[in-house]
Amino acid sequence: NVWLHNEMLQVEGKKMSKSLGNFFTVRDLLDQGIPGEVIRYVFLMTHYRKPMDWTAEKVAEATKTLDTLYEVVGETSPDRSQAPNPEVVAALADDLNSSAALHALIRQAGTIRPGDTAAAAGLKHSAGLLGLLPMTGEEWRRLKSGGIDLSGLGARLQELRIAAKASKDFSAVDALKSALLAAGVEVRMTAAGVDLAPGAGFDAEAVEALK
């Protein structure tokens, strides 16, 4: 893979410079636990002819968007027999307008209904033109968690919910949920049960301390 950029690189609005102490490499970002796909997405958010500003806000936005896209594609494989999204192709043909291509992918994802595996496979094929969504949703969640199994904490939270419904005291549920959110874990509680997933700012050490 080759990444090119023809304009100034910034970090949180300031020029990237060793003298300012804000210089880092892609390897540094990976060592911080930021997935490579998130780094790629942040880069693609800015056209290569424009100044690129690396910010924590963009990292969070990229992570959240990838979470959504992976939730849509689930465990499907790319269907290369389908023609890719013409809006994505047109954006890339327009002087590699990667930002417009990303927005086209997001719009495409928004039209896909749950269970429509054919459409999901088409989205995955289109995303592949940008080097995105190379894995399954489960693989993505596992990567973000650093291999940490969240199922035990999910089961504990569900047990607390059941007990709280009987006692009408939800303080233990709220406490564990708050701790999980503070550790960067997304908590989804439905009638079917509890689903935990790594979110933006996932802190593996904090999660381990909750076990």
Model-predicted segments: where are they?
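Residues immediately flanking
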Residues: 6-7, 45
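Structural preference for alpha-helix termini/caps and helix-kink/transition segments
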Residues: 15-17, 21-211
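Second-shell residues forming the walls of enzyme active-site clefts
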Residues: 1-5, 13
